[in-house]
Swiss-Prot record:
<feature type="modified residue" description="Phosphoserine">
    <location>
        <position position="15"/>
    </location>
</feature>
<keyword id="KW-0158">Chromosome</keyword>
<dbReference type="GO" id="GO:0044877">
    <property type="term" value="F:protein-containing complex binding"/>
</dbReference>
<dbReference type="GO" id="GO:0006357">
    <property type="term" value="P:regulation of transcription by RNA polymerase II"/>
</dbReference>
<feature type="compositionally biased region" description="Pro residues">
    <location>
        <begin position="171"/>
        <end position="194"/>
    </location>
</feature>
<feature type="region of interest" description="Disordered">
    <location>
        <begin position="89"/>
        <end position="237"/>
    </location>
</feature>
<feature type="region of interest" description="Disordered">
    <location>
        <begin position="1"/>
        <end position="33"/>
    </location>
</feature>
<feature type="compositionally biased region" description="Basic and acidic residues">
    <location>
        <begin position="228"/>
        <end position="237"/>
    </location>
</feature>
<dbReference type="GO" id="GO:0140673">
    <property type="term" value="P:transcription elongation-coupled chromatin remodeling"/>
</dbReference>
<feature type="compositionally biased region" description="Pro residues">
    <location>
        <begin position="1"/>
        <end position="10"/>
    </location>
</feature>
<dbReference type="InterPro" id="IPR027971">
    <property type="entry name" value="EPOP"/>
</dbReference>
<dbReference type="Pfam" id="PF15223">
    <property type="entry name" value="EPOP"/>
</dbReference>
<feature type="modified residue" description="Phosphoserine">
    <location>
        <position position="19"/>
    </location>
</feature>
<feature type="compositionally biased region" description="Pro residues">
    <location>
        <begin position="282"/>
        <end position="296"/>
    </location>
</feature>
<keyword id="KW-0488">Methylation</keyword>
<keyword id="KW-0156">Chromatin regulator</keyword>
<protein>
    <recommendedName>
        <fullName>Elongin BC and Polycomb repressive complex 2-associated protein</fullName>
    </recommendedName>
</protein>
Amino acid sequence: METLCPPPRLAVPASPRGSPCSPTPLKPRRGTPEFSPLCLRALAFCALAKPRPSSLGLGPGELAPRTPVLLGPPASPCTGGWAADGLKHLGGQAGRPSDVSSPAREDADVAVCPGGGEEEEGGGGFPHFGAGSCAPPGRCPAPLRPQDSPTNPAWSPPRPARGLDAASSPPLEPGSPPPSPPAGLSPEPAPSEQPVPASEAPGGGDPAPTAPEAPALSPSTADAAPDPPRDLRQEHFNRLIRRSKLWCYAKGFALDTPSLRRGPERPAAKARGAAKKRRRPAPPPPSVQPRRPVPTLPTSSTFSLLDCFPCPPALVVEENGDLGPASSLRLQGDAKPPPAHPLWKWQMGGPAVPEPPGLKSWWVNLEEL
């Protein structure tokens, strides 16, 4: 059996399986270690699972996360020990069987941190100040006095918001008195909010004088009101656009006038009307032109057949159908045609085109012979 079992390989020591977050031990590399995708995903999950900072460190646009009723946030310096004590009281209420439902827990949570709901509705603000807090945003309210501690019988637990009582708070027992608001807050509304009834008004029953209403703005005062600040860059951009070539081509070069450069104090409607008037000038009055005289028709025709020929014809057909000299058409009586007339050079049997002078007399000689 000893010969069949292979001996253990001691050359390569067995290394424990590394965690996914450890760098790969295959090749020792210089520089920053490389992490596997699983390790990076685990790191991202751990970063997301970290608790968010307290509501005091939130930016103006962040929403304060709702804290569970039983756990509660750590007491911040601006809220003192009131938030933790209120959470204990609400936790005791939540411990009753079928007494507080899940919406009621959320409402109680909102009552503990009333600023969180306001921040979620309004977006941003100071979540650690409630609606009834009179301290300005820059200061923290004073911590509770010893007589305001929960052990004091005069101390009462915090009261949820009014709008949430009727909606989702559990019905109160018939024998228990209604819970009072936290110390420092009176159950009655502020005197400025509560109107004084006519029966309790001082001065023998006369109603209290109300504040005079602001007089309505007259048209003159409305006109005299200061104009909203104008954007000089936008005006300059509009002026450049209206002076550009494309705008001028589109509008017919009528808007690039001194009236536009005068400034925006001129009403836009008047400037537009003036531009339209300049763009469409009135047509000039029609000038009275003398009419041309009606052309009179000639009594005799001016057409001449012989004038249309490039050269006077030599022979024409006479009335008897025979050929005759063309000069006979213009001759009056027994007059002879002029010596340049082709009649003198034309002979029977001769060529139609005149010959050169050297060959001119050969046919005459033939006739004589």
